[in-house]
């Protein structure tokens, strides 16, 4: 489904949803690129096997004709095998050369110092080539083991895990959990606690975090009857790093904002692009030396029922 047609396509589906839970009903799945103006599509799976946090399970099917409820659905998914270890070798090569990267960092620094922008996030790419086909199932299991509290995803070869919730809308309630400001984790509890304390007290990281919070709040507020956030940031720890995070919760005014419109309005946040957004993105496009593609974009899962 083309992104420009996604809302209308979903709205025109006739739904028989006896589960009536977040995520039930037809679900569009996709990844919005860092530059959301680039062409991108969403997928409507014909078969979804779902499980909620409270243990409920259900199956969603997409049919061209009405399904007789007395019919049974044959879930012949075949045997599910745990991934096995491979003897693959890997070659790591840089994408953008170090000179281009350092030039981009210098350009961003100078733009901030001159007052042209408040922030810009510069990235560089690395290519890892395997001697054997990469088992995505194995990658996802590793991500689940290491980043179990994060959102794991696999969309058409775009695989990862993120602890950040850009935006969720359920029955008119809007929530977001932006992250910005980061410190490493070492695996030693005492050292990590010290790093977390330093992160919370860091003026630089608190400013960086507040830029993101203000941007998300100011973007969503025109659609809300109220929108509030936690008075202080908290630590969100994952396997290798820890972030500053702030939960945001509000109520949408009617007519309710569509979650796709919210995603496009928010993305990319200053945590991944910069601020002001248009100026920062223009600088990134001029100096970064690569196309980010879906990196730094957003994974999205949209259910019609919610």
Residue ranges and their predicted role:
Residues 1-5, 71-106, 110, 124, ...:
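Contiguous alpha-helical scaffold segments within structured protein domains
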């Amino acid at each position: 489904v083309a992104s420009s047609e996604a809302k209308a396509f979903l709205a025109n589906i006739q739904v028989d949803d006896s589960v009536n839970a977040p995520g039930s009903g037809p679900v569009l799945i996709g990844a919005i690129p860092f530059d959301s103006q680039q062409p991108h599509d969403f997928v409507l799976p014909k078969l979804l096997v779902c499980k909620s946090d409270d243990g409920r399970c259900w199956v969603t099917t997409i049919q061209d004709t009405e399904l007789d409820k007395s019919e049974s659905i044959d879930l012949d998914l075949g045997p599910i095998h745990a991934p096995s270890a491979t003897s693959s070798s890997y070659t790591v090569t840089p994408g953008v050369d170090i000179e281009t990267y350092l030039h981009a960092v210098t350009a961003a620094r100078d733009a901030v110092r001159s007052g042209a922008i408040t922030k810009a996030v510069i990235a560089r790419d690395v290519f890892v080539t395997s001697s054997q086909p990469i088992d995505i199932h194995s990658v996802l299991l590793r991500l689940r083991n290491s980043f179990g509290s994060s959102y794991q995803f696999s969309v058409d070869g775009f695989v990862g895990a993120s602890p950040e919730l850009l935006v969720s809308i359920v029955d008119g309630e809007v929530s977001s959990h932006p992250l910005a400001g980061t410190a490493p984790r070492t695996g030693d509890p005492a050292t990590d606690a010290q790093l977390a304390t330093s992160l919370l007290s860091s003026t630089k990281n608190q400013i960086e975090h507040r830029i993101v919070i203000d941007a998300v709040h100011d973007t969503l507020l025109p659609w809300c009857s109220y929108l509030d956030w936690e008075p202080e940031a908290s630590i969100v720890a994952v396997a290798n790093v820890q972030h500053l995070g702030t939960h945001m919760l509000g109520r949408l005014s009617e007519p309710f904002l569509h979650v796709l419109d919210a995603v496009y309005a928010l993305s990319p946040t200053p945590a991944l692009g910069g601020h002001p957004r248009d100026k920062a993105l223009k600088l990134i496009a001029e100096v970064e030396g690569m196309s980010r593609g879906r990196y730094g974009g957003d994974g999205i899962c949209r259910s019609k029922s919610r």
